[in-house]
C-alpha cells in the first residue's frame, strides 16, 4: 500500500514511522509512506500556507492553493482514497481501518492545522476522519494513528493472523483480560480456569469476560453488537424460509 501524507511538519513522523511493527513493515516494503510538505507548493516567496479568515475571527486558516497542488502532485493508483483528518469527520473505527486496508491501494492523508482548512479543501477529500470528539493541535496525530492502524492489518505486518482476529473490536467486543507469569503477584491470582488446560472452558471464560467488559465499559458497543446479532438471526430466518 502507498500512503502519501500532506503535512506541514514531516519531522513529526520520524520516530513513529521507524518504531515497532510499523517501522518493520515499512522496512520490509509492506507499505510505503511519502511525506509531502505543502510549503513546497506555496505561491509566494515566503512559502505561506495560511491566511486570516474571511469574516474575521481568531487564528489562521490553511490556504487552498498549496494543499490542492500538493495533493495533485501525487501519482494516483487505480483505487485511491483521499482523507482529510479533521474533528468534523466520522470517528475512526476498526471497521474503517479494515475497509481502508482491504479495499484501497493508496491513501492520501491531508493533515489539518491552525484554526482549520479553507472549506474548499474538502472538495479534495473522499471522506473526513476524526479520532474523536476532542481537539488536537494538528492533524499529524490522527494521521499517524490511522497509518499505524491500517498498516498493521496488511498481510505480513503481524506475525500471527490469529493475533488480529482475537483483538478488541474485531468481533465488536472489547478484549478479555490477559495474564502472564507469575501466577500470583501481590496477592492477585490469575483465574484458575486459565491454568486448567481445558481449552473449551478457557474459550468460554474469555467470551464471558468480553461480554461483561463491553457491557460495563462500552454500553454503546454492546448495543451495536446486540443489533448485529439480532440482524444475523433475522437473516438466517429469511434464508431458511426461502
From Swiss-Prot:
Gene Ontology annotations of biological process type: tRNA N1-guanine methylation
EC number: 2.1.1.228
Transit peptide listed as a keyword: no
Pfam family, one: tRNA_m1G_MT
Major location (coarse): cytoplasm
CDD domains reported in the protein's UniProt record: TrmD-like
GO cellular component: a single term: cytosol
GO molecular function: tRNA (guanine(37)-N1)-methyltransferase activity
InterPro entries cross-referenced by the UniProt entry: Alpha/beta_knot_MTases, tRNA_m1G_MeTrfase_C_sf, tRNA_m1G_MeTrfase_TrmD, tRNA_m1G_MTases_N, tRNA_MeTrfase_TRMD/TRM10
Domain of life: Bacteria
Compartment list: Cytoplasm
Keywords: Cytoplasm, Methyltransferase, S-adenosyl-L-methionine, Transferase, tRNA processing
Gene3D superfamilies membership: 3.40.1280.10, tRNA(m1g37)methyltransferase, domain 2 (1.10.1270.20)
Reactions catalysed according to its record: guanosine(37) in tRNA + S-adenosyl-L-methionine = N(1)-methylguanosine(37) in tRNA + S-adenosyl-L-homocysteine + H(+)
Chain positions recorded as S-adenosyl-L-methionine binding sites: 112, 131-136
HAMAP family in UniProt: TrmD
Subunit structure: Homodimer.
Family from the record: Belongs to the RNA methyltransferase TrmD family.
Function description: Specifically methylates guanosine-37 in various tRNAs.
PANTHER family named among the record's database cross-references: TRNA (GUANINE-N(1)-)-METHYLTRANSFERASE
NCBIfam families in the cross-refs: PRK00026.1, trmD
Name by which UniProt lists this protein: tRNA (guanine-N(1)-)-methyltransferase
Organism of derivation: Crocosphaera subtropica (strain ATCC 51142 / BH68) (Cyanothece sp. (strain ATCC 51142))
Amino acid at each position: 500500500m502507498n500512503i502519501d501524507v500532506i503535512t506541514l511538519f514531516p519531522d513529526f513522523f520520524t520516530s513513529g514511522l521507524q518504531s515497532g511493527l510499523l517501522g518493520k513493515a515499512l522496512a520490509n516494503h509492506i507499505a510505503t509512506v511519502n511525506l509531502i510538505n505543502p510549503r513546497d507548493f506555496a505561491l509566494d516567496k515566503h512559502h505561506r500556507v495560511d491566511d486570516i479568515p474571511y469574516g474575521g475571527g481568531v487564528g489562521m486558516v490553511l490556504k487552498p492553493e498549496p494543499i490542492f497542488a500538493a495533493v495533485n502532485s501525487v501519482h494516483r493508483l487505480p483505487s485511491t482514497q483521499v482523507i482529510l483528518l479533521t474533528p468534523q469527520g466520522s470517528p475512526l473505527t476498526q471497521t474503517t481501518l479494515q475497509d481502508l486496508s482491504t479495499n484501497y491501494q493508496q491513501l492520501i492523508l491531508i493533515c489539518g492545522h491552525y484554526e482549520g482548512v479553507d472549506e474548499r479543501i474538502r472538495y479534495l477529500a473522499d471522506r473526513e476522519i476524526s479520532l474523536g470528539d476532542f481537539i488536537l493541535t494538528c492533524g499529524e496525530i490522527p494521521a499517524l494513528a490511522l497509518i499505524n492502524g491500517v498498516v498493521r492489518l496488511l498481510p505480513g505486518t503481524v506475525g500471527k493472523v490469529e493475533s488480529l482476529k482475537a483483538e478488541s473490536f474485531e468481533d465488536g467486543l472489547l478484549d478479555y483480560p490477559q495474564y502472564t507469569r507469575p501466577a500470583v503477584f501481590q496477592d492477585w491470582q490469575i483465574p484458575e480456569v486459565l491454568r486448567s488446560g481445558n481449552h473449551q472452558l478457557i474459550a468460554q471464560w474469555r467470551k464471558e469476560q468480553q461480554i461483561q467488559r463491553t457491557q460495563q465499559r462500552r454500553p454503546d458497543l454492546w448495543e451495536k453488537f446486540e443489533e448485529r446479532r439480532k440482524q444475523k438471526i433475522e437473516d438466517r430466518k429469511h434464508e431458511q424460509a426461502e
